[in-house]
């Protein structure tokens, strides 16, 4: 019996630089990470996503601890009468201190060096370890089911690098991945973005696919 897992990046979030004038809160770090919400466009795109034929008949849903993933999932949850399982191990990478000046090549470097990180941040390897830990638990508890995991850009891409080969990464955030010699992704990651993983009876990944949707053209908060 095969298990199907959909790794789903959240929809378009707000651009805080454009919409927030000031921060008067003791929780600024949390507000800037976990509590970031979807944009108006992001809400519309999340609802469109919930109606895609590929994502019907889901058995179980997991989300990260961040508001924007739950906001993306809520349309699918309501439509299919499901409840979310929140797991912080699916959270986005902790970026750490701003690094553009000290590491102008930080975007490509974080993909090419799995141990690269800035002060207070996480490395590719660290993110992959926690995401994989959660993933293995999820598939172990839901064998043979159709699983949707709503998570984040880096969390997904770093996790996929456990099985995929990084063919290319560019400063303008274009990424090319291959699985078993076949290119499975070659573009910028969309908001939302969906990857379909098919696992065999032994919970080994047999196939990785990127699922495009014609009614969800590229959009992102930092496009």
Task: For each feature predicted by the language model, list its residue ranges.
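Beta-strand elements within well-structured catalytic alpha/beta cores of enzymes
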Residues: 4-8, 62, 142-151, 155
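Phosphate-handling substructures
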Residues: 14-18, 28-37, 77-133, 173-174, ...
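Active-site-proximal alpha-helix that buttresses catalytic centers in soluble enzyme cores
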Residues: 2-82
